[in-house]
Each structure stands twice: as structure tokens, then as C-alpha cells.
Amino acid sequence: FLLLAMFAVILAACGGSESEDTAAAKPAAAKPAAEKPAAASLTLEEAAAQRAGGPGSFYIGDLSQLVGPAPAPTLGDEDDMVNLAGLERERYLFDSPYYAALVKKANFTNPTKLVYDGDPIEIQFTCINRTVAPCKLVDAVITENIKERTQGKLTLEITSFPELGLAGPDTLALVRDGTIAFTEITSGYVAGDLPQLEITFLYGLFPDHEVEFKVNAAVQGDLDKLIQDDTAGGQVISRMWISGGDNFFFCRDKIETAADFKGKKVRSHGAALSDWIEAFGANAQFVAFAEVYTALERGILDCGVTVAFAAHGQRWYEVTDYMVGPLSSQLINTMVINAKVLADLPEDIRQILVEEGARHELEAMRVTPAWNEVWTQRNIDAGLEYIEFTPEMKEIQLNKAVPIHVLPNWIKRVGGPDTDIVRLFNEKIAPIVGLKINDDGTTTQVPITK
């Protein structure tokens, strides 16, 4: 008996039996599952191979890897594809240091992991107009990719200037004071507020897309700083590169000679463009993009100037009969976010936004080379007669519009030749275009070295 009693005491002390009070206790929590080991970082070549053949593909030496479907209908060629011919024509984009820097910024080999597990965050992004191709590209690419990468923790809600009752010239101020959180900014619209931004929108100065791209790539960092200073810390998240973004005159009456422009009331979307229009004897007028259709329909305007895809998106072919051009342009608008909105984002979400901004730029470079051809044809198919600029018009542009109107008037708007922006022009742009601005505001031809 003594041995049995001692054995019972030992069992009790060791927990070998339970009282009725402890018998129903919850089982111990299961051990957390071990974290999966982090996947080894991809090489850039492996990442490019995985993404080849469609949306999200990028170039590291083989343009054929970019060939494939566009990210959404109407954003590629006539078959909604990205074809090799268009890529080859704009190859300078992909071989540029700027493109290589975007690939690095996009962080394909070691993308930022999602850590944030709080409430979902929604940011409103404001396009100039949601009916035009660049806004559709934003919606199809950066909006969808951010939603997927953050598992819905960050969503971008697309709206537009017309929906918010905006015209565009005060966009920078609205970002500055937080009225707009995240928006598309086109330099021509805000030239009254920050004319320095028009340094890359000096119509007629850049003879082709490649020269204009070199200019844009050379000064984008400087322009980002201007925007940051003007918007109290606003940041450029992405650029809406459109290598198929030539401007055209959509007119009610036929424009066959330079004299036909005289006296015409022409919608302009920027100060430098207005100077170009005035050089031809026409009367430039700023009209909000969403209001141009009605102004053309009622005869308030004789012509409207915009890119082919934008005119088609707004159905200008219903109120005009002629499409005249092209005025060479590689349209580049910026996507700028309010400083506080960006700062308030969790660090991982913020970095994912930056990476997806770079990837959006890469996708824009992939799909837009076809846009001039495809959207010009769509306007023709809608009933417009296409008239190319005559040699006379090109001569007036070269010898009158640019040297007498566009460049001198821009110099005046930025405060004269003794300004930082003119010095930037001479340092970074003059060697590309072969034209230097002198101390008295005149210009001198210089060797093209870049």
C-alpha cells in the first residue's frame, strides 16, 4: 500500500492525472508553420524570358521578346498586337540608357514583397480623359498590376478632368494643396504655372521622334525636380510615353496650303503650340479637351489640334472633315502624386507603386510605336481625309515658326535667357538639336554631338 501511495503522489506531481477542472482546457496552440524559404532571385535574363511574348515583357537585347498581345483592346496595332516592325522603327527607345535605368528601377529580379496587412487603401488617379488610349493603358497596366501585387491592399480608382469639372491649367496647384491625390500632368496645360516644363514641348524644334526622345531623356530628372518643388514635394511616379503621339490639325475646312491656315480659329493645348499656330496666321485658342467637340460642331472653332488617338476617342471625325499633319511629337505626360499621399503609404506599398510605375513606362514604350499608324487609319476609316504637310508648310515651320515664334516666346515666358532653364537647354539640349540660345535671346547653330 505504501508503495502504491508513493507512486500515486509521483504521478500527480508529474501531471500524470488531471482534475475535473483542468480536463476541459483548450489544447495547446499548434506551432506556426515554418516560413517558406525565400525564392532565389532571378537573373535579368530569366525574368525577361518568363515575361516574353505579351504584356509586361521587357527588352534586354532581343526585341522579338516584346512581340505579342497588347494589354487591352485598341492599345496595340490594328490586330491589338505589338509587332516587330514598329519596335524596330523605334529601336532607339530600347537601346537607350534611360530604358536600361527603367528596367533596373522596375526591380524584376527581386521585386518588393508585400508586408502591409492593414486596411485596404484607395487612391484616386485623375486622367485628362478616360476615353483616350493613355488612360486606358494606365487602367490596364498599372492599376491592375498594383491591385494584384498588393492583393487588393492598394487600389487606384480612375477618374478624369471632365468628371471632376477640371480644365487642366491648375493641375499643379491642385496636387500641391492635396485637392488631387494623383494625376496626369501635361506640360502644355500647366505652362502658365510652370513654363519651364515646356522645354520638351517646343513644337517644330525636334525634327523626329528619336531627337525628341533624346531631349526628353536628357532632362527628365531636372523636370522631376521642378515638379517636386512646385508641388511642395509631389513625386513623379511614372511617365506616359507615347512614341506614336504626333499632333494633327482636325479641321472643318480643307487645308491644302499654308495660306489656308490664315484666320482660322484653332484649338491649342499649350503655349508653345499656340506660338506655332500663330506663326501660320491662325488664331490659337485654349479650349478644354472635353469641350472641343461642341466648339467644332457649332463653328466656334475651325480646327482642333491633338494626337490621332485622342481625336478618335472624342469622335472629332463627326464634326470635322480633314486631318492635316503630322506635327512631329513624342508626347510624354507625367503621373504625379501628392507628397503627403505618398508619404502616408506603408513603405512596402510605396516601393511597389514605384516599381509598377517603371513597369508602366516600359509597357508604354512597348505598345505605343504603332499608335500613329493605327489611329491615323482609324480616323481615315471614320471618314476623314488625310492631308500631309506640304513642303511650304515645313519650310515655314523651320524658318519662321521655331526661330521667330516658338523659341523666343518660350524664352520670354521663363524669364529671359539668363535663367536656369535656358542654361539647362544650352547644356543638355543644344548638343542634341544643334541650336544654342545666346545671352541676348537669339540663337546660334552649334555642332550636334549627342
Residues covered by each model-derived region:
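Acidic/polar, low-complexity intrinsically disordered N-terminal segments immediately downstream
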Residues: 34, 39-41
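Bacterial lipoprotein signal-peptidase II cleavage site
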Residues: 15-25
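Alpha-helical transmembrane segments
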Residues: 5-8
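N-terminal secretory/targeting leader peptides
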Residues: 15-17, 42-206, 210, 236-450
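Low-complexity, polybasic segments enriched for Lys interleaved with small residues
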Residues: 28-29, 33-34
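C-terminal motif of bacterial Sec signal peptides marking the signal peptidase cleavage site
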Residues: 10-13
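A gly/proline- and charged-residue-enriched helix-loop-helix capping module
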Residues: 207-228
